[in-house]
């Protein structure tokens, strides 16, 4: 009885193994991989360009100078208030 049950199970297991990988498990094609890498590289280059443009725009703008002046003025006001109260 054991041989009668184990033989079909063995045949099914061998057929499954010899069938090979299914479509979802197959190795990705080289074209798909290179296309994916090209898209990733393009995304990286685009991101790099946008970040460089952002930092250049910040360097050229007067925002850092205004911020520095605002902090300096606020610090001076706080120091003056502390001197008056002391």
From Swiss-Prot:
GO molecular function: fatty acid binding; phospholipase inhibitor activity
UniProtKB keywords: Lipid transport, Secreted, Signal, Transport, VLDL
Cysteines paired by S-S bonds: none
Signal peptide: 1-26
Any single GO CC term annotated in Swiss-Prot or TrEMBL for this entry: very-low-density lipoprotein particle
Pfam families, per the entry: ApoC-I
Biological-process GO terms, alphabetical: lipid transport; lipoprotein metabolic process; negative regulation of cholesterol transport; negative regulation of lipid catabolic process; negative regulation of very-low-density lipoprotein particle clearance; triglyceride metabolic process; very-low-density lipoprotein particle clearance
Listed InterPro entries: ApoC-1_sf, ApoC-I
Subcellular location: Secreted
Main subcellular location: secreted
Keyword flag Transport: yes
Described function: Inhibitor of lipoprotein binding to the low density lipoprotein (LDL) receptor, LDL receptor-related protein, and very low density lipoprotein (VLDL) receptor. Associates with high density lipoproteins (HDL) and the triacylglycerol-rich lipoproteins in the plasma and makes up about 10% of the protein of the VLDL and 2% of that of HDL. Appears to interfere directly with fatty acid uptake and is also the major plasma inhibitor of cholesteryl ester transfer protein (CETP). Binds free fatty acids and reduces their intracellular esterification.
Entry similarity comment: Belongs to the apolipoprotein C1 family.
Note: Apolipoprotein C-I is present in acidic (APOC1A) and basic (APOC1B) forms in P.paniscus, P.abelii and P.troglodytes and perhaps also in baboons and macaques. The two genes for ApoC-I arose through a duplication process that occurred after the divergence of New World monkeys from the human lineage. In human, the acidic form has become a pseudogene sometime between the divergence of bonobos and chimpanzees from the human lineage and the appearance of the Denisovans. Pseudogenization resulted when the codon for the penultimate amino acid in the signal sequence was changed to a stop codon.
Protein name in the entry: Apolipoprotein C-I
Organism field: Plecturocebus moloch (Dusky titi monkey)
Name of the gene: APOC1
């Amino acid at each position: 009885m054991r041989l009668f049950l184990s033989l079909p199970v063995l045949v099914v297991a061998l057929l499954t193994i010899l069938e090979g990988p299914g479509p979802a498990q197959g190795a990705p094609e080289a074209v798909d991989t290179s296309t994916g890498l090209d898209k990733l590289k393009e995304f990286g280059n685009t991101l790099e360009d946008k970040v460089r443009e952002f930092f250049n725009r910040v360097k050229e703008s007067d925002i850092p100078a205004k911020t520095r002046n605002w902090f300096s003025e606020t610090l001076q006001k706080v120091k003056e208030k502390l001197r008056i109260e002391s």
